[in-house]
Amino acid sequence: HQKIIEEAPAPGLSDEQRRAMGAAAVRAAEAIGYEGAGTVEFLLAPDGEFFFMEMNTRLQVEHPVTELITGQDLVAWQLQVADGAPLPLAQNEIPLNGAAMEVRAYAEDPARGFLPSAGTLTRAHWPRENVRVDTGFEEGDTVSDHYDPMVAKIIAHGSDRDRARRRLCQGLRQTRLTGIRHNLDFLLRVLESEPFAAAELDTRLLELHAELLEVP
């Protein structure tokens, strides 16, 4: 499976499940005496049971959605803890505000099995209102075939899930990339699709809605 859109808080996850996952993640880190930034991944079954997948000893691509709903700079936290400082806040001191969504802008062709598309960015225009854009690419830069083809992360925050989704859609419409094939239109189709808007999600989304991969 491929990560396409990330969001926080996770839709369909109860507060009880969220607390249980958090406690399990803490126990996993404590069991090996781990100190530092880390990301524990779980897979949620339809019956509400969850299963450990993996732990990455770092922040992950999707950390901005957590930053936007908590108002915290996790990169700064990571560096402070690595320098021997305690965590700035305890778990019960971390605020949760609204919802956030992130898409990964890739130089790839979704209709051809997400085949990477190397080339030179002849135009790269990123949105500036109501979204956050994390990127290291500018016009004239080359997307190499030797590395991951992600060119940017576009993230939106809103008072609720639908507002965040709509802001992200607006941001995608304002983005312009030329010189490479990209997944922006595909991302917009997914965000605007009925199952995604209704948060009717599982790992079979594209399998059940293959039309989202098709170019209109």
Stretches found by the model and what they are:
Residues 1-216:
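ATP-dependent carboxylate activation and anion-phosphoryl transfer catalytic cores
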